[in-house]
Regions:
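Core catalytic lobe of class I
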Residues: 1-137
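S-adenosyl-L-methionine
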Residues: 140-154
Length: 154
C-alpha cells in the first residue's frame, strides 16, 4: 500500500480475557504509519513540556512517548459495543503529536468511526474507509447524529 511504519505501539489494557490454557491477553497492537516520511510531522512538546513531572518525579514528557500505553478502556452505559472502538485517548495522543488543526487525518480501517470522531473534536479534517457494512453504518450514525461520547482528558 506504500505506508511507512513509524511505530508499533502496544496498548496495555485491564480486564483481558481469562483462559485456562494460556496467558491472559491484555494488550492490543496499534500501527502508526505515514504515507510520506519526508513530509511527516511530529510535535514532541504538544502534550507535555520537557520539565513536566509526575507525582513521583518522573518525566511526563519522556513517559508519554514510550511505545507501551497503559490507557483505560472507555465504558458507557447503554452504548453499542463494537470490537473496533479504541479509547479516544489513544487516537487523541497520536493526533496531538502528529498533526495540527485543519490537517487531514486518514484512517483506512475506520471501524466504529472513532478516528473521525476524535479528529473532528480536535479540529482536524478526516477521510476514512470501512468495508464492513455494520461498522460503516455504526460510524455513519455516530457522525451524522453527533453521537461522539468520548472521554474528556486534560
Amino acid at each position: 500500500v506504500g505506508f511507512t511504519t513509524i511505530n508499533h505501539i502496544i496498548w496495555k489494557y485491564q480486564f483481558g480475557v481469562v483462559t485456562k490454557k494460556k496467558f491472559v491477553t491484555s494488550h492490543y497492537h496499534c500501527l502508526y504509519v505515514c504515507k510520506d516520511d519526508k513530509q511527516r510531522k511530529f510535535f514532541p512538546f504538544s502534550r507535555f513540556k520537557k520539565e513536566d513531572k509526575s507525582e513521583n518525579g518522573r518525566s511526563l514528557h519522556y513517559r508519554d512517548k514510550e511505545d507501551v500505553w497503559d490507557i483505560k478502556r472507555e465504558y458507557w452505559t447503554g452504548d453499542e459495543k463494537t470490537p473496533t472502538k479504541l479509547p479516544s485517548e489513544i487516537i487523541k495522543k497520536l493526533l496531538e503529536y502528529s498533526s495540527e488543526k485543519k490537517d487531514i487525518v486518514f484512517d483506512p480501517f475506520l471501524g466504529s468511526g472513532q478516528t473521525a470522531v476524535v479528529s473532528k473534536s480536535l479540529n482536524r479534517r478526516f477521510i476514512g474507509f470501512e468495508i464492513v457494512p455494520d461498522y460503516y453504518k455504526f460510524a455513519k450514525k455516530r457522525l451524522d447524529k453527533d453521537m461522539y461520547r468520548i472521554k474528556k482528558t486534560k
